[in-house]
Curated annotation (Swiss-Prot):
Protein name: NADH-quinone oxidoreductase subunit D 1
PANTHER family reported for this sequence: NADH DEHYDROGENASE [UBIQUINONE] IRON-SULFUR PROTEIN 2, MITOCHONDRIAL (PTHR11993:SF10), NADH-UBIQUINONE OXIDOREDUCTASE 49 KDA SUBUNIT (PTHR11993)
Function: NDH-1 shuttles electrons from NADH, via FMN and iron-sulfur (Fe-S) centers, to quinones in the respiratory chain. The immediate electron acceptor for the enzyme in this species is believed to be ubiquinone. Couples the redox reaction to proton translocation (for every two electrons transferred, four hydrogen ions are translocated across the cytoplasmic membrane), and thus conserves the redox energy in a proton gradient.
Keyword flag Translocase: yes
Main location: membrane
Entry membrane topology: Peripheral membrane protein
Location in the cell: Cell inner membrane
GO MF assignments: NAD binding; NADH:ubiquinone reductase (non-electrogenic) activity; quinone binding
Lineage top rank: taxon: Bacteria
Subunit structure: NDH-1 is composed of 14 different subunits. Subunits NuoB, C, D, E, F, and G constitute the peripheral sector of the complex.
InterPro entries: NADH_Q_OxRdtase_suD, NADH_UbQ_OxRdtase_49kDa_CS, NDH1_su_D/H, NiFe-Hase_large
Similarity comment: family membership: Belongs to the complex I 49 kDa subunit family.
Length: 381
């Protein structure tokens, strides 16, 4: 008896037989190009992506539940551990949300210090994105340049508050640390250096034939889909939507500085790259103005040592490097929040991955994940 399977010409026309070309492939959770412990289940037909499913939660630490068992002040350092690449932005969003809840406003000097530190952090975050995104696609050199320049931002943070990554730079009511001697000079010197270096980054990538082939027309997400999925940040602006919370709903001292909101046209990987490159230039522009306008005065408002906000609820959001970062806080009048709900941009933007890679090649999945600029500490919380 023969055990061989005979295939007839009619079998080749049978749909069920052709379906055997479909393959389910697990990408991650231990994969260098998922930028964390993300598992992506890919359904493939050859090298074409038919669909994806993201499996998250490998880095879940229960941050929102921890908030219910800490005082408002005690929970402040925890938010730095979500998007640990942009810890300063996390702290700013949380502190401003609690300040709204207790009806306290940070002094003008603190507002400008917050803008300076947050924009430095935006630059550092975008440089991590650029270096790793380029590396994913096969360009090694930009990684060394971007991490070299990011190091100078981390040194400024270290001199300001003693920490480099999870800075805990802000407090409810303002900034606990005064600017160190030479702070303004360090920031302006860095701005002078970084402008030409951004031109160097673009010289390596923007006109590169391989870079263009790997990014142009890849991972398209149009404006309508962005709005339907709740996507924000550079991903939304790359689709042509001019929405930036620093302009639309100004906070801190952003209403006192002038800057543009870069947008794209096609909503593809290349446009998302270009939007972030232009954002870095705008951050330099904001930093120069903020240093020039930095007023004298106290950096902390008068805030009770024991915070006991009145019964109520508040939602406050800021423009983090990756998009809209929001905090919904419910107070029951006790020392601890009744509920803290975080709206992390990485979590929301990741939902768009399936829409962006359907019909693309498997090699393009890595490029699209990189251009979303997700951090799994923020996705999983």
């Amino acid at each position: 008896m023969s055990t061989a399977i005979e295939v007839t010409p009619s079998d080749l026309e049978n749909k069920t037989f052709l379906d055997s070309n479909e393959l389910v492939l697990n990408m991650g959770p231990q994969h260098p190009s998922t930028h964390g412990v993300l598992r992506v289940i890919l359904k493939l037909d050859g090298e074409r992506v038919l669909g994806t499913e993201c499996v998250i939660g490998y880095l879940h630490r229960g941050v929102e539940k921890i908030a219910e068992n800490r005082t408002y002040v005690q929970f402040n350092p925890y938010v730095d551990r979500m998007d640990y690449v942009a810890a300063v932005s996390n702290g700013l969003g949380y502190c401003e949300a609690v300040e709204k809840l207790i009806d306290v406003q940070a002094p003008p000097r603190a507002q400008f210090l917050r803008v300076i530190l947050t924009e430095l952090n935006r630059l550092a975050s975008h440089m991590v994105w650029l270096g790793t995104h380029a590396l994913d696609i096969g360009a090694l050199t930009p990684l060394f340049y971007t991490f070299r320049d990011r190091e100078e931002v981390l040194k400024i943070f270290e001199k300001y508050c003693g920490a480099r990554l999870t800075t805990h730079a802000f407090r409810i009511g303002g900034c606990i640390y005064e600017a160190y001697e030479g702070f303004e000079k360090d920031v302006l010197d860095y701005c002078d250096k970084l402008g030409p270096r951004i031109d160097e980054y673009e010289g390596l990538l923007t006109g590169n034939r391989i870079w263009l082939q790997r990014t142009k027309g890849i991972g398209i997400l149009n404006a309508a889909d962005c709005k339907a999925l709740g996507v924000t940040g550079p991903v939304l602006r790359a689709a042509g939507v001019k929405w930036d919370l620093r302009k639309a709903q100004p906070y801190a001292a952003y209403d006192q500085v002038d800057f543009d909101v870069p947008t794209g046209e096609n909503g593809d990987t290349f446009d998302r790259y270009m939007v972030r490159m232009q954002e870095m230039r705008q951050s330099i522009r904001i930093l120069r103005q903020a240093v020039e306008k930095l007023p004298a005065g106290p950096t902390m408002a008068k805030v009770p040592k024991v915070l006991k906000p009145p019964v109520g609820r508040i939602y406050h959001s800021i423009e983090a490097p990756k998009g809209e970062l929001g905090y919904f806080i419910v107070s029951d009048g006790s020392l601890q929040p009744y509920r803290v709900r975080v709206r992390p941009p990485s979590f929301v933007n990741l939902q768009a991955l399936d829409k962006m890679v359907r019909g693309a090649l498997i090699a393009d999945v890595v490029a699209v994940i990189g251009t979303l600029d997700i951090v799994l500490g923020e996705v999983d919380r």
